UniProtKB/Swiss-Prot annotation:
Pfam family for this entry, one: XTBD
Keywords: Acetylation
Residue(s) carrying N-acetylmethionine: 1
Keyword tRNA processing: no
InterPro entries: XTBD (IPR021859)
Family statement: Belongs to the CARF family.
Entry protein name: CDKN2AIP N-terminal-like protein
Record note on quaternary structure: Interacts with XRN2; the interaction is direct.
Length: 116
């Protein structure tokens, strides 16, 4: 019977992961590539328990979605933001593996090369 209990526990876990992924899917942007979405969905799902909206509202989920966009925009599009905000989202994303990220050159780097 122990095997049956373990199997039921695994099925419950898989079902929960599926439900969470289905829930997150509604927040995918039309313009996001599969790679961008997978990374951002991992960011969202990782922090979803801490950002669930309280019964009286409060916008915690909106805050999480905004933070996920800041992180994705910085990573994939090279957008820059306030240092404190970037520090926060980079800390939140610690451990999320993203391969083949684009490389960006800042204006300052271009100016230094031009002056050399």
């Amino acid at each position: 019977m122990v095997g049956g209990e373990a199997s039921a526990a695994v099925e419950k876990l898989v079902s929960g992961v599926r439900q969470a992924a289905d829930f997150a899917e509604q927040f995918r942007s039309y313009s996001e590539s599969e790679k961008q979405w997978k990374a951002r969905m991992e960011f969202i799902l990782r922090h979803l328990p801490d950002y669930r909206d309280p019964p009286d509202g409060g916008g915690r989920l909106d805050q999480l979605l905004s933070l996920s966009m800041v992180w994705a925009n910085h990573l994939f599009l090279g957008c820059s933001y306030n240092k404190d905000l970037l520090d926060k989202v980079m800390e939140m994303a610690d451990g999320i593996e993203v391969e083949d990220l684009p490389q960006f050159t800042t204006r300052s780097e271009l100016m230094r090369k031009h002056q050399s």
